[in-house]
Regions:
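Short beta-strand elements that form the blades of beta-propeller/WD-repeat-like
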Residues: 1-8, 36-54, 79-92, 120-131, ...
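Surface-exposed loop/turn elements that mediate protein-protein interactions on large endomembrane-trafficking
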Residues: 8-29, 48-70, 91-113, 133-151, ...
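Repeated scaffold domains used in trafficking and secretory/extracellular systems
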Residues: 28-42, 67-80, 112-125, 152-164
Length: 178
Protein backbone atom coordinates (compact mmCIF):
# COMPACT_ATOMS: atom_id res chain seq x y z
CA UNK A 1 0.00 0.00 0.00
CA UNK A 2 1.10 3.59 -0.51
CA UNK A 3 0.45 6.69 1.49
CA UNK A 4 1.91 10.01 2.40
CA UNK A 5 3.30 11.23 5.69
CA UNK A 6 4.61 14.76 6.26
CA UNK A 7 4.93 15.39 2.52
CA UNK A 8 6.85 12.19 1.76
CA UNK A 9 5.73 8.91 0.23
CA UNK A 10 5.44 5.94 2.53
CA UNK A 11 4.97 2.42 1.26
CA UNK A 12 3.90 -0.58 3.28
CA UNK A 13 4.45 -4.11 2.10
CA UNK A 14 1.62 -6.13 3.61
CA UNK A 15 1.85 -9.93 3.59
CA UNK A 16 -1.16 -12.23 3.50
CA UNK A 17 -1.59 -16.00 3.56
CA UNK A 18 -3.80 -17.25 0.76
CA UNK A 19 -6.24 -18.87 3.17
CA UNK A 20 -6.65 -15.82 5.46
CA UNK A 21 -8.23 -12.41 5.10
CA UNK A 22 -6.04 -10.68 7.65
CA UNK A 23 -2.38 -9.84 7.04
CA UNK A 24 0.20 -11.78 9.00
CA UNK A 25 3.02 -9.24 8.63
CA UNK A 26 3.88 -5.84 7.20
CA UNK A 27 6.96 -3.74 6.58
CA UNK A 28 6.88 0.06 6.35
CA UNK A 29 9.29 1.74 3.94
CA UNK A 30 9.28 5.42 4.95
CA UNK A 31 10.10 7.96 2.27
CA UNK A 32 9.93 5.31 -0.46
CA UNK A 33 7.56 4.87 -3.40
CA UNK A 34 7.55 1.21 -4.46
CA UNK A 35 7.34 0.70 -8.24
CA UNK A 36 7.42 -3.10 -8.34
CA UNK A 37 7.40 -6.03 -5.92
CA UNK A 38 8.51 -9.60 -6.50
CA UNK A 39 10.50 -12.51 -5.12
CA UNK A 40 14.28 -12.61 -5.38
CA UNK A 41 15.55 -15.83 -3.89
CA UNK A 42 13.59 -16.32 -0.67
CA UNK A 43 12.99 -12.62 -0.02
CA UNK A 44 10.55 -10.08 -1.35
CA UNK A 45 12.17 -7.29 -3.35
CA UNK A 46 10.58 -3.85 -3.43
CA UNK A 47 11.88 -1.82 -6.37
CA UNK A 48 11.96 1.86 -5.48
CA UNK A 49 13.34 5.11 -6.87
CA UNK A 50 16.33 5.06 -4.49
CA UNK A 51 17.19 1.36 -4.45
CA UNK A 52 16.09 -2.21 -3.89
CA UNK A 53 14.60 -3.12 -0.50
CA UNK A 54 14.59 -6.78 0.52
CA UNK A 55 12.02 -8.03 3.01
CA UNK A 56 12.04 -11.46 4.63
CA UNK A 57 8.99 -13.73 4.84
CA UNK A 58 8.24 -12.45 8.35
CA UNK A 59 7.85 -8.89 7.06
CA UNK A 60 11.17 -7.57 8.36
CA UNK A 61 13.54 -5.37 6.37
CA UNK A 62 16.44 -7.76 5.65
CA UNK A 63 18.76 -5.94 3.23
CA UNK A 64 18.89 -3.11 0.74
CA UNK A 65 20.84 -1.95 -2.28
CA UNK A 66 21.28 1.76 -3.01
CA UNK A 67 21.53 3.08 -6.56
CA UNK A 68 24.13 5.60 -5.28
CA UNK A 69 22.62 8.50 -7.18
CA UNK A 70 21.83 6.47 -10.29
CA UNK A 71 18.45 6.86 -11.95
CA UNK A 72 16.33 3.72 -12.30
CA UNK A 73 15.61 2.98 -15.96
CA UNK A 74 14.55 -0.69 -15.88
CA UNK A 75 14.45 -3.59 -13.46
CA UNK A 76 13.80 -7.31 -13.87
CA UNK A 77 13.14 -9.57 -10.88
CA UNK A 78 12.89 -12.85 -12.80
CA UNK A 79 16.53 -13.88 -12.40
CA UNK A 80 17.40 -17.01 -10.45
CA UNK A 81 18.12 -15.46 -7.03
CA UNK A 82 19.00 -11.98 -8.32
CA UNK A 83 17.53 -8.75 -9.65
CA UNK A 84 18.87 -7.05 -12.78
CA UNK A 85 18.80 -3.25 -12.66
CA UNK A 86 19.54 -0.77 -15.43
CA UNK A 87 20.60 2.61 -14.05
CA UNK A 88 21.24 5.89 -15.82
CA UNK A 89 23.90 8.29 -14.65
CA UNK A 90 21.54 11.15 -15.44
CA UNK A 91 17.78 11.48 -16.02
CA UNK A 92 18.45 11.64 -19.78
CA UNK A 93 21.27 10.28 -21.89
CA UNK A 94 22.75 6.95 -22.80
CA UNK A 95 25.41 6.49 -20.11
CA UNK A 96 24.06 3.45 -18.33
CA UNK A 97 25.13 0.91 -15.75
CA UNK A 98 23.76 -2.63 -15.58
CA UNK A 99 23.88 -4.25 -12.14
CA UNK A 100 22.84 -7.65 -10.80
CA UNK A 101 22.04 -7.84 -7.08
CA UNK A 102 21.32 -10.86 -4.87
CA UNK A 103 18.75 -10.96 -2.05
CA UNK A 104 21.42 -9.95 0.49
CA UNK A 105 21.78 -6.62 -1.34
CA UNK A 106 25.22 -7.58 -2.71
CA UNK A 107 26.31 -6.83 -6.26
CA UNK A 108 26.99 -9.94 -8.32
CA UNK A 109 28.14 -7.90 -11.30
CA UNK A 110 28.30 -4.37 -12.65
CA UNK A 111 28.87 -3.22 -16.20
CA UNK A 112 28.99 0.23 -17.81
CA UNK A 113 26.95 0.38 -21.02
CA UNK A 114 27.02 3.07 -23.65
CA UNK A 115 24.25 3.01 -26.18
CA UNK A 116 20.53 3.11 -26.66
CA UNK A 117 18.98 0.27 -24.63
CA UNK A 118 15.53 -0.59 -25.95
CA UNK A 119 14.70 -3.45 -23.60
CA UNK A 120 16.12 -5.62 -20.83
CA UNK A 121 14.96 -8.94 -19.39
CA UNK A 122 16.36 -11.44 -16.88
CA UNK A 123 15.45 -15.09 -16.42
CA UNK A 124 17.29 -17.98 -14.83
CA UNK A 125 21.04 -17.37 -15.02
CA UNK A 126 20.89 -14.85 -17.88
CA UNK A 127 20.23 -11.17 -18.59
CA UNK A 128 19.34 -10.02 -22.11
CA UNK A 129 19.96 -6.42 -23.17
CA UNK A 130 18.53 -5.24 -26.48
CA UNK A 131 20.41 -2.32 -27.99
CA UNK A 132 19.28 -0.53 -31.17
CA UNK A 133 21.73 -2.59 -33.27
CA UNK A 134 22.38 -5.80 -31.31
CA UNK A 135 21.25 -8.19 -28.60
CA UNK A 136 23.72 -9.12 -25.87
CA UNK A 137 23.08 -11.90 -23.36
CA UNK A 138 25.09 -11.89 -20.12
CA UNK A 139 25.30 -14.37 -17.28
CA UNK A 140 24.22 -13.23 -13.82
CA UNK A 141 27.77 -12.01 -13.09
CA UNK A 142 27.51 -9.89 -16.27
CA UNK A 143 30.07 -11.80 -18.30
CA UNK A 144 29.08 -11.81 -21.96
CA UNK A 145 27.47 -15.09 -23.00
CA UNK A 146 26.24 -14.40 -26.56
CA UNK A 147 25.70 -11.59 -29.07
CA UNK A 148 23.39 -11.25 -32.05
CA UNK A 149 23.95 -8.41 -34.54
CA UNK A 150 21.39 -6.91 -36.90
CA UNK A 151 18.31 -6.77 -34.71
CA UNK A 152 17.05 -3.37 -35.85
CA UNK A 153 13.48 -4.65 -36.37
CA UNK A 154 13.18 -5.80 -32.74
CA UNK A 155 11.84 -3.49 -30.06
CA UNK A 156 11.54 -5.83 -27.10
CA UNK A 157 13.33 -8.87 -25.67
CA UNK A 158 12.15 -11.60 -23.31
CA UNK A 159 14.90 -13.71 -21.76
CA UNK A 160 14.04 -17.34 -21.06
CA UNK A 161 15.55 -19.53 -18.37
CA UNK A 162 17.08 -21.96 -20.89
CA UNK A 163 19.38 -19.24 -22.31
CA UNK A 164 17.28 -18.45 -25.36
CA UNK A 165 15.73 -15.05 -25.97
CA UNK A 166 12.55 -14.01 -27.75
CA UNK A 167 12.92 -10.87 -29.89
CA UNK A 168 9.68 -9.08 -30.71
CA UNK A 169 8.99 -6.32 -33.20
CA UNK A 170 5.86 -4.66 -34.51
CA UNK A 171 5.34 -7.27 -37.24
CA UNK A 172 7.06 -10.46 -36.06
CA UNK A 173 8.84 -12.29 -33.27
CA UNK A 174 11.77 -14.70 -33.35
CA UNK A 175 13.74 -16.88 -30.96
CA UNK A 176 17.51 -16.52 -30.60
CA UNK A 177 19.22 -19.77 -29.56
CA UNK A 178 22.86 -19.01 -28.67
Amino acid sequence: TMGQSQGAFTSSVVLYKLNRQDPYASCDLAGVAVYDLGLVGKRYCAVAEDGLHFIDRKGRAAASYSYDGGVLRRCSLEGDGYAAVLLGRYKVGSQLRLVTVNSDGKELGSLDLDGDVLSMSASGRYVAVLFADRLVIYNKNLKEYATLQGVSSAGDVLMRGDGSAVLAGSAAASVFLP
